[in-house]
């Protein structure tokens, strides 16, 4: 997946609130939009090397968007608002997943029951609904989701469980936005409700998938490089 826009090297200074951070670009402090409502405490540390997207539109509240962070010698994408869905959509369209190749139609933002899911796949009476979650928190090569409580995420899991119980197929795809994870686990420490809902969903037959991405700042790319297990014990 191509990382869109003009990327500029910068230095992280501090996070002002969930949506805005202070960064230093060419020696000048600038406001940057943070496209991720997670805590990101292990990534957004004073002095961290970052890449920001420069915006040309003058009607934006900030001139930059905080897109990549350097951590332990690798680049991490913190764009959870757009990147996970984009990379999943490209992979589906390109037929990269064997289990989804039989579906002839891909729809985005599909409403079922009381929730809107990222993707609906359809083919000759078959239906498969996918919710995508971006993972940025990795500790000891273990990815954890979420890194902040998410009632919306828990509700999605509950609705996917109902869909599966009604006889339709459903799955959760965790997109790990960095290359240094070998497994993904629910983050019980941060959101026990989400973790329990994930286990209930798995017991009901909801598929749990996780894909690791390599982020290349020089080439302006983020690509899925391998699938890893989701461990819920």
Swiss-Prot record:
Sorted alphabetically, which InterPro entries does this protein's record hold? SfsA, SfsA_C, SfsA_N
- From the UniProt record, which GO molecular function terms apply? DNA binding
What the record says about family reads:
Belongs to the SfsA family.
What's the name of the protein?
Sugar fermentation stimulation protein homolog
